[in-house]
A protein has these predicted regions:
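Hydrophobic transmembrane architecture of multi-pass small-molecule transporters
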Residues: 44, 174, 399-434
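Glycine/proline-centered helix-kink
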Residues: 115, 136, 141, 145-153, ...
Length: 435
């Protein structure tokens, strides 16, 4: 595939990836609106987010196994179509219970979309242009979480919460039609390996319980809650059992042999740590703007959005010129930029203007593509073509799980520090009153 057809396929794959990643963040600002419309509490409305994240977390690592049984192109096309249809159902839901069920269905459909879009793009481009393909893919993965809160806030202000789901319909249908027309669907292998039933059960139970801990832990006081303790024990037992089972299973649902490649293992470890850091600043910064500086969700989103400008530009530059530089140098440069911006952010004060806050955020857009694109290229650089879908699914699962860890830990840390400082202020005021 070349020329206009390759460009159209790249555009369609990018759109599908964009709406999937966007949908995982756009609902964050819609919780109060959903709660008010459906007459439930804010904590109950957060199940709209949790149900999606749990279902997606279960589906992502199954991508490689499903691709073997169904075919990559067929699985991707059907995932896009079902994701679009479940978006329609989410927007039409008239009560919280139905909305949560539809969001869980949407999460299951979304799981294969991001890893398969990466694998299909890499296979469509010639080897010498794979870094450019990864740069195009990384742009959508990096930019969607940045613009999600802005778009979500604007849609809710101008229309109503169902439209954050309805907006997926034209985009999803176009991506489905284009991919269905352009992707060659190979017939499934008639000699299917036996189904790893035990592996699937352990994966679903372990990942579901772990994601439940991350989503519900803060609201239940973490390990002060018997629910969280129980879920943690279930997750630990199931995931340890999964590792033991899969290491001996001849036809595993998760291919642990990928970790024998040091490049894959090291790249996944570094990018996972990077996602923890990125998610921390991505959560704490808007939280500080809204709870301390008095910004609305939309204003906070506008403050973060400039990050996407330089990220877009440098994604293309890294994709075009990475082969002329040592990838380790580019990655280190991206990390140093990110570290410098974090140090800058640490000195923010309550008297800073909008533009003083935006400037370091804008500069941060240089570091993100320089860090993530070379690592994404390295992770898959030595993976055989027949294992690309499995490797992409596994690396994306660990990346997403790391972001969930970072989000849960950062919000808990924020709440604890806020309670500590508010307590000090209260004690100070009491002391003054007695004087």
């Amino acid at each position: 595939m070349r020329g206009a057809m390759l460009a159209l396929l790249t555009f369609a794959l990018s759109l599908a990836t964009f709406i999937e990643v966007l949908d995982s963040t756009v609902t964050n600002v819609a919780v109060p609106s959903i709660a008010g419309s459906l007459a439930v509490s804010n904590s109950q409305a957060t199940w709209v987010i949790s149900s999606y994240s749990v279902a997606a977390a279960i589906a992502v690592p199954l991508t490689g196994w499903l691709s073997q049984r169904i075919g990559e192109a067929r699985l991707f096309v059907w995932s896009v179509l079902l994701f679009t249809l479940t978006s329609l159902l989410c927007g039409m839901a008239g009560n919280l219970e139905l909305l949560v069920v539809c969001r869980a269905m949407q999460g299951l459909c979304s799981g294969p979309m991001v890893p398969l879009s990466q694998a299909i793009l890499l296979r469509a481009f010639p080897p010498e242009r794979r870094v450019l393909a990864l740069a195009l893919w990384a742009m959508t993965v990096l930019l969607a979480p940045i613009f999600g809160p802005v778009l979500g806030g604007w849609i809710i202000d101008q229309f109503s919460w169902p439209w954050i789901f309805f907006i997926n319909l034209p985009i999803g249908l176009f991506a489905f039609a284009a991919c269905a027309a352009l992707l060659r669907r190979e017939p499934p292998d008639p000699h299917q390996p036996p189904m790893d039933v035990m592996g699937i059960v352990l994966l679903v139970v372990g990942v579901g319980a772990l994601q439940g801990v991350l989503d519900l832990g803060r609201d239940h006081g973490w390990f002060d809650s018997s629910l969280i303790v129980g879920l943690s024990l279930i997750a630990a037992l199931a995931l340890v059992s999964l590792l033991i089972w899969e290491s001996a299973e001849p036809y595993p649902v998760i291919d642990l042999s990928l970790f024998r490649d040091r490049t894959f293992s090291f790249g996944v470890a570094i990018i996972s740590l990077g996602m923890v850091s990125f998610s921390v600043i991505g959560v704490i910064f808007p939280l500080w703007l809204q709870t301390v500086m008095g910004y609305t969700a939309f204003q906070a989103g506008l403050t973060v959005a400039p990050l996407g400008i330089l990220a877009l530009v440098f994604s293309m530059l890294v994709g075009m010129f990475l082969d002329r530089f040592d990838a380790r140098v580019v990655t280190s440069f991206g990390f140093l930029v990110f570290f410098a911006v974090l140090s800058w952010d640490a000195h923010f004060t309550l008297t800073m203007s909008f533009w003083q806050i935006v400037t370091p955020t804008f500069i941060q857009g240089i570091g993100l593509p320089c860090f993530f694109i070379p690592l994404s290229a390295a992770i898959l650089s030595r993976v055989p073509n027949e294992k690309l879908a499995a490797a992409s699914g596994l690396s994306n699962f660990l990346r997403t799980l790391s972001a969930a860890f970072g989000t849960a830990l950062s919000v808990t840390w924020w709440d604890n520090r806020a309670a500590h400082h508010y307590g000090n202020i209260a004690q100070s005021e009491i002391g003054r009153a007695h004087v």
